[in-house]
Amino acid sequence: MNYIISFKNLILTVVLLIFTVHGSSAEKSIALGYEPKYDTGFVHFDYVDPTSTKKGTIRLSAFGTFESLNPFLLKSLAPAGLNDLVFETLMERSLDEPSSSYGHIASGYNLANDGLSVTYYIKDNATFSNGDSITSSDVLFSYSTLISEVAHPQYRIYWADIKSVKILDEKSIKFIFKRKNPELHMIIGDIPIFSRKWLEGKEFDQTILEKPIASGPYIIDSFEPGRYITYKRNQNYWAIEEPTRVGMYNFDYIKFKYYKDMTVGLEAFKAGEYDYIFENHSKRWARDYSGPNFVNGSIKKLQLKHDNNAGIQGFIFNTRKEIFQNKKVREAITYAFDFKWSNQNLFYNQYQRCTSFFSNSELSANIKPSDNERKLAKKLSIPEKKVINKNLSFIN
């Protein structure tokens, strides 16, 4: 009897251990170098409207062509929107943090204490568009396909530090690392997951025009290579109430129409063939956005303030060349460039002088030193005048 009781207790302990590993002990988010913004149990991202109505059609433009419904190849072109609308990943990156991910297809993960492996756990309700449950076998198949010689080489480079992969059970999969890599457990969460049924009887590196079987919020409704593609919101989408999807993907249909070049595309927009255009060319913005539909209000021309990193545009010195290794030469050329005249006469006063490689973000350098910069300069015995001149010399 004592043996039977002990055995039952052992079974109970094992069951509880499995439950703990798959449930409460698994990490739900990843943030590199800081605490994640969203707590476990968050309802939705702050940048979405959870009350958004789901209806309507939006018509967009794309340029060039497409020839395959496989977005994971180097040699063929896939249609606009395919990766973002049809395929999904284990984790979902948030758009209001520098580098954070939250469980999406995966409910969570466990990073080994030695940092040499990570185990991901797949949500029980995660399904593909054909209704099949997503399993660890699908994750392994997707990963193995993407790092093969026939896929785009970027994937082999991206996950080069993965030594091996082991399926633990139907919903658990373990990735073993070659060496410690502080980002690897996060970028494993970026693996796009698709069903092996999509590729049955096909060569992955050949042109594939069969509609993908994946887990995203949209499925392909209709398409004509090089002409258009229309995505339809999946009415049976598994993640519609997941916090990583609430308030997102609200259009019933998203259609991309293809144009051979920007000039033709802009004229098509002005004629009302699609609904939205983003312009980054100062001359076109200043001279070409006019016509009857602008006058009658059918088209609204707006400049919207945003907080996205704008990057940098300019002349970059190749300091491997001897002439540019002299700092004073580089500084003299910088002074010789008349930005004010160029902006007025070439760029229609549309540009602002870049002051940082991280323009329009909290990481950018300010013209005036911050309080912390002043304190650091004082601590290092650097005169404040030098700190100010250092900043100003970049833009003057």
Model-derived features with residue positions:
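Bacterial N-terminal signal peptides
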Residues: 10-20
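N-terminal lobe/hinge region of extracytoplasmic solute-binding protein
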Residues: 26-114, 121, 144, 213
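Short, well-ordered beta-strand elements
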Residues: 27-29, 55-64, 107, 117-120, ...
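Aromatic- and charge-enriched surface segment that lines or borders ligand/interaction sites
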Residues: 38, 48-53, 75-82, 108-152, ...
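Gly/Pro-rich hinge or "lid" segments in bacterial periplasmic/extracellular proteins
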Residues: 87-97, 188-253, 260-264, 271, ...
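Surface-exposed binding/hinge segments that line
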Residues: 121, 155-200, 217-224, 374
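Extracellular/periplasmic solute-recognition and catalytic clefts
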Residues: 164-167, 221-232, 257-321, 332, ...
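Append "and occasionally in soluble cytosolic enzymes with long acidic Gly/Pro-rich linkers
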Residues: 325-396
